[in-house]
């Protein structure tokens, strides 16, 4: 399992790792004692990797060298098995900052999907915080828990409720309500009851018509101020010697993020 609490950062049995070849290509692998990694007619035992330091170079049976790295959370999210469409790292970063997710926060989330956002929330709230995730689909819940287990290991600050958040939120005095749902406006009345004063409501939506509907619901509730909507566009650059230019492809629109602060009325 992967954990930054592991000071020596050595690879362990059951951990997800990335092989990086000389061209920078990544090959994900889950370590399992006794198994063998094979690549283009070459091989190396998983046992020869377990116990090695993060960032080490290993040599396969015919001499090819690979760098072995623990995946970052962003890399893991993009490679992990998916039961549902994930929120991409560029949007997760915006959610963590605009949602002001902090250590020891109590966060209600719906739905859990494949667990991408959940893992970032768990990291942000830390061991003293808690993430309560509402998810009606059992297959999504199971897939997310598997993904979280592989990357985070045993997690004590996650509570999964297989309930429909459209019918209500059982928690009171929570710090944040984070929604990745088709109709978040149906949750606004429940969020009013669940959020503490000063708490933040945040939702992630793919279309601007959905955004318009949820913003109207937030305003009509009379309980929210500072209602803002944004989207995050990311463009990488090619920088090589004297050749400096934007990459030909960029990650443009994926979704809109709407935030609002709850106040006493």
Give short role names for the model-derived ranges.
Residues 101, 123-130, 197, 224:
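Conserved S-adenosyl-L-methionine
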Residues 188-256:
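C-terminal substrate-binding/active-site "lid" region of AdoMet-derived donor-dependent transferases
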Residues 7-9, 79-92:
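Conserved SAM-binding loop and adjacent beta-strand
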Residues 97-102, 124, 152, 169, ...:
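Glycine-rich helix-loop-beta junction characteristic of Rossmann-like nucleotide cofactor-binding loops
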Residues 102-113:
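Conserved class I S-adenosyl-L-methionine
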Residues 114-127, 193:
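Conserved SAM-binding loop of SAM-dependent methyltransferases across substrates and taxa
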Residues 134-184:
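S-adenosyl-L-methionine
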Residues 1-70:
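N-terminal auxiliary segments of SAM/dcSAM-dependent transferases
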């Amino acid at each position: 399992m992967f954990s930054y609490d592991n000071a020596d950062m050595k690879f362990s049995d059951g951990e997800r790792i990335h092989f990086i070849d000389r061209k920078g290509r990544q090959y994900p692998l889950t370590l399992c004692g006794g198994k063998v990694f094979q690549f283009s007619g070459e091989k190396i035992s998983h046992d020869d990797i377990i116990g090695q330091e993060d960032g080490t170079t290993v040599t396969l049976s015919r001499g090819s060298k690979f760098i072995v790295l623990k995946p970052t959370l962003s890399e893991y999210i993009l490679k992990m098995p998916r039961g549902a469409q994930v929120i991409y790292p560029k949007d997760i970063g915006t959610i963590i900052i605009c949602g002001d997710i902090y250590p020891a926060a109590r966060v209600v989330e719906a739905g859990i999907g494949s667990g991408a956002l959940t893992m970032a929330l768990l990291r942000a709230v830390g061991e003293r915080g808690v993430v309560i995730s509402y998810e009606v689909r059992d297959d999504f819940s199971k897939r997310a828990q598997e993904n979280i287990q592989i990357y985070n290991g045993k997690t004590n600050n996650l509570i999964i409720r297989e309930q429909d958040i459209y019918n209500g939120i059982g928690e009171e005095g929570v710090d944040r309500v984070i929604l990745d749902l088709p109709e978040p406006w149906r949750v606004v009345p429940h969020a009013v009851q669940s959020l503490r004063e000063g708490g933040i409501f945040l939702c992630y939506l793919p279309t601007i018509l959905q955004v318009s509907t949820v913003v109207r619901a937030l305003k009509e509730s009379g309980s929210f101020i500072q209602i803002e909507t944004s989207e995050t566009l990311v463009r990488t650059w090619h920088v090589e010697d004297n050749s400096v230019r934007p990459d030909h492809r960029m990650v443009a629109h994926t979704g809109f993020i709407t935030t609002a602060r709850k106040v006493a009325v």
